[in-house]
Amino acid sequence: MSDLEVQVPTAFDPFADANAEDSGAGTKEYVHIRVQQRNGRKSLTTVQGLKKEYSYSKILKDLKKEFCCNGTVVQDSELGQVIQLQGDQRKNVSTFLVQAGLVKKDNIKIHGF
């Protein structure tokens, strides 16, 4: 007889490797950056989903200084703490969070218009 190697079918878990890589803290938690239209040309940018151990007031202070806009931290019952900034600052906030090392680029979701 010839030497044939026969593969025995076994159970395959396609998510086994993915789950092993995602063991880091907050890897699947997305940061949502939204813009809301106010009256006329005025708009409001909201940032939600940052880790709870971050100091929201310090992040807000740096964002306000960097983008020359006003802002506040709002406590929401469902969403937790949400950062609100005046104007459409979606791109600015996303690049700021990535450069500061607070969030990975893959974990940012930008919504609006």
UniProtKB/Swiss-Prot annotation:
GO terms assigned for molecular function: mRNA binding; translation initiation factor activity
CDD domains (UniProt xref): eIF1_SUI1
UniProt keyword terms in alphabetical order: Acetylation, Protein biosynthesis, Translation regulation
GO BP, sorted A to Z: regulation of translation
Transmembrane segments: none
Record-listed N-acetylserine modification sites: 2
InterPro entries per UniProt: SUI1, SUI1_dom_sf, SUI1_euk
Gene3D superfamilies: SUI1-like domain
One GO CC term, this protein: nucleus
Highest taxon, organism lineage: Eukaryota
Family: Belongs to the SUI1 family.
Function: Probably involved in translation.
NCBIfam families, alphabetized: SUI1_MOF2 (TIGR01160)
Name of the protein described by the UniProt record: Protein translation factor SUI1 homolog 2
Highest classification ranks of the organism: Eukaryota, Viridiplantae, Streptophyta, Embryophyta, Tracheophyta
